Amino acid sequence: MNLIKGSLLASLLCISPLCNAHFDDIGAKTRAKIESIIDEYVSTHPEIIIRAMQKLEHDEQAIQANNVKNAGIALRNDNTLPQVNTSKAKHYIIEFFDFNCGYCKVLEPMFEKALKEFDLQIIYVNIPIIKEESSQSAVFAQAVYNVDKKAYFKFHKYFMTPGYKSSDTDTLKKLCKEYNVEFDKVLAELKSKRPHERITKSIAQSSNLKISGTPYLIIDGKELRGAFRDYSQLKALLED
């Protein structure tokens, strides 16, 4: 209400001799009189509030849609992010996820099925927001990706399997040995701070998209907050 009132006040000032005066420089009596006129107008024309709120919502949706579109273009071509296939694919899914997100884990089998059925690129953007342990596994996995891109997906599959997955040092060492990744190389990459910087950038990108939880998906330019009930929903979006 105050936002609408302020906009009307500014509009009235701009069609009056006071247009060139600063908003805060008008006299108290003049300001009070103008506000009284606005109050009376709004009270007798309540539809103006509805129209103003609808316009505000429409403008915010347009801004968000543009942000999603730009994010899709940028992330599809960002080789610092784990991805399956390239931006030449007809369809794409960008997933903002957390290794400790149960709903994200539910999506993994659906993604695997979609990759077999569609010309599809999948980009994984790790945003560790659920618990402190998520940050450790996210940064470590990013370091693995920087060292050995193929090996990363073995780590990804491990962490995205349903159930709790430890990310303590002993477990990570064991995984590196099992997946033929040199642990010392991963440690050296961690010391470079590049993995930390990538995860920090991902979190900043999620903030720009107003992401408040995982999973958050961008599918062929359209955003989707939350998981699918079943594969048919994902398939329908890719066939659209």
Each PLM stretch: what is its role?
Residues 129-240:
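Cysteine-centric redox/oxidoreductase cores and disulfide-bonded domains
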Residues 19-132, 190-191, 195-213, 219, ...:
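Extracytoplasmic thiol/disulfide redox context detector
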Residues 6, 30-31, 183:
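Short amphipathic alpha-helical segments that mediate assembly, nucleic-acid/protein binding
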Residues 9, 109, 113, 233-236:
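Alpha-helical scaffolding segments of alpha/beta enzyme cores, especially the outer helices
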Residues 1-21:
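Classical Sec-dependent N-terminal signal peptides that target proteins to the secretory pathway
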